[in-house]
């Protein structure tokens, strides 16, 4: 009887322990699943702290070859001396997965200011190398993320150097806020930005990422008509020479036009400031008409729409209203040499 009771007690203890282990395993699995981001990348529990006393570099895994998928790496650079700053310079060999709608959503490298949590920049793609970044204090954080799709090469390599405050002042001129400019001066300042991301970050440093995402929410887009220039058949060399004269003497060619001047909109800033259009150009030295002087004029004109960023002052409210808009521009598709006095005849 005692033996039977001992066996029952042992069985109960074993069952209770197995149940606790199963519950623990289920809890761990749930925590692991909830720790994943929506794109399937698991966030790291700890960042790698690098004590900086001299120049050095960090890079994506396997640089300059294809980096691995499903990766999140965070480095925090901390200078030993508190009165120095850290400057980051990207290697010319830069390439991550391309952005979607000019927004780096999937694979990207991001630089953050640890003192206030502000994002200094997020980059991806391979069309341009990111510019230099300078910390506000003696620390700076770098974050690299890749999702489970489309890894690229060569990744990135960032060289870091130490700067004293007076070096920073001489190297980086003061950038005035948008509110310090009139509309015409702000138009000139906007011309210096090479990407929409840099422009929005300048206009709205505290909420530029939200503004950039809001900017691309509309799904509609007006497309201009496509135009194709036909080619003539070329039989012999003389025909070729004559055809080249015809093609390049008075033909549609690329011209850059200022949107504010072209649209006569001095109350608005457009970005990009200028666009390429087809306009008639060239000379008419071999004009076939019997007149003293010929000129090149368009004989077929079409209107095409181009989507650009529009910045307009808000009435009674500080800041600029930002929106994507379609602007109509004239394109010359066919040109002809005519007598100057008969241009309108």
Swiss-Prot record:
One of its GO terms (molecular function) is platelet-derived growth factor receptor binding. Its main location: secreted. Proteolytic removal of the N-terminal CUB domain releasing the core domain is necessary for unmasking the receptor-binding epitopes of the core domain. Cleavage after basic residues in the hinge region (region connecting the CUB and growth factor domains) gives rise to the receptor-binding form. Keywords: Cleavage on pair of basic residues, Developmental protein, Disulfide bond, Glycoprotein, Growth factor, Mitogen, Secreted, Signal. Glycans are attached at residues 25, 55. Disulfide bonds join 104-124, 250-294, 280-335, 287-337. The record marks 225-226, 231-232, 234-235 as: Cleavage. PANTHER family: PLATELET-DERIVED GROWTH FACTOR (PTHR11633), PLATELET-DERIVED GROWTH FACTOR C (PTHR11633:SF5). This is Platelet-derived growth factor C.
